Swiss-Prot record:
Protein name: Probable transcriptional regulatory protein trd_1132
Sample GO molecular function, one term: DNA binding
Keywords: Cytoplasm, DNA-binding, Transcription, Transcription regulation
GO cellular component: cytosol
InterPro entries assigned to the protein according to its UniProt record, in alphabetical order: Integrase-like_N, TACO1_YebC-like_2nd/3rd_dom, TACO1_YebC_N, Transcrip_reg_TACO1-like, Transcrip_reg_TACO1-like_dom3, YebC-like
Gene3D superfamilies the record matches: 1.10.10.200, 3.30.70.980
């Protein structure tokens, strides 16, 4: 796959460049809301909420905004919408698999918009389970090298219970079992490493290399899904050539 980049790499580059910060905050507030509704407002006993708060802090979300999101979801403040999680699965140009995870207060609205985006860029929305089997759910931690030897970070992660690692630019991407994510992240942070991101991800078991027009169309489809306020995460098994990556 020399010269090609995975969608996850492209997303991390965009986030590092501080793109769409307001939209990121909006999505994080929704995640906090759902976490509170499912497990209560105490991050000590609610792992999903604790992870959402940690991610919000790493993204620079103000403390007051985090606290307001928790208060709204717990009923201490009025005006809270009710969200449900919906997973959309489909195919993009070149037959690549795509998953979009949405938190929505209107499933009909979201389904209509998602279907339109798939169609607009040469894809098709599929049935539940149509592509999920092509992905594995893992914990993923992005650690800044920040002057440290990447191998040193990787060894510390393995000692803390991580499964695997990959060095990427100025980061080390750590993979864990989902239930080990929080524990490994806490140990790395306690050891003095800078955690840029720690969350549950769906990674493709194999990738499909795209070229030319198919790569351009697939990237536009993925970015259009990412731009939807209702969509929290987008995953694909596509990989993209360097010229498409540099155009992002």
């Amino acid at each position: 796959m020399a010269g090609h980049s995975k969608w996850a790499q492209i997303k991390r580059q965009k986030q590092a460049a501080d793109f769409r910060k307001g939209q990121i905050f909006s999505k994080l507030a929704r995640e906090i809301h759902v976490a509170v509704r499912e497990g209560g407002p105490n991050p000590e006993t609610n792992v999903r909420l604790r992870m959402a708060i940690e991610r919000a802090r790493r993204e620079g979300m103000p403390k007051d905004t985090i606290e307001n999101a928790i208060a709204k979801a717990s009923g201490a403040a009025g005006g809270a919408a009710e969200y449900e999680t919906i997973v959309y699965e489909g195919y993009g140009p070149g037959g690549v698999a795509i998953m979009a995870i949405a938190l929505t207060d209107n499933r009909n609205r979201t389904a209509s918009v998602v279907r339109h985006i798939f169609s607009k860029y040469g894809g098709s929305l599929g049935e539940t389970g149509s592509v999920a089997w092509q992905f594995e759910t893992v914990g993923q931690i992005v650690v800044a090298t920040d002057g440290h030897d990447p191998e040193e970070i990787a060894l510390a992660a393995i000692d803390a219970g991580a499964r695997d690692f990959e060095v990427e630019d100025d980061s080390v991407i750590i993979t864990t079992d989902p239930d080990q994510l929080s524990d490994v992240a806490e140990k790395l942070e306690a050891a003095g490493y800078q955690i840029r991101q720690a969350d549950i991800q769906r990674i493709p078991t194999t990738t499909v290399e795209l070229e030319g027009g198919q790569a351009q169309s697939a990237l536009k489809l993925l970015e259009a899904l990412e731009d939807l306020d209702d969509v929290q995460e987008v995953y694909t098994n596509a990989s993209f050539p360097a010229e498409v990556r540099s155009a992002v």
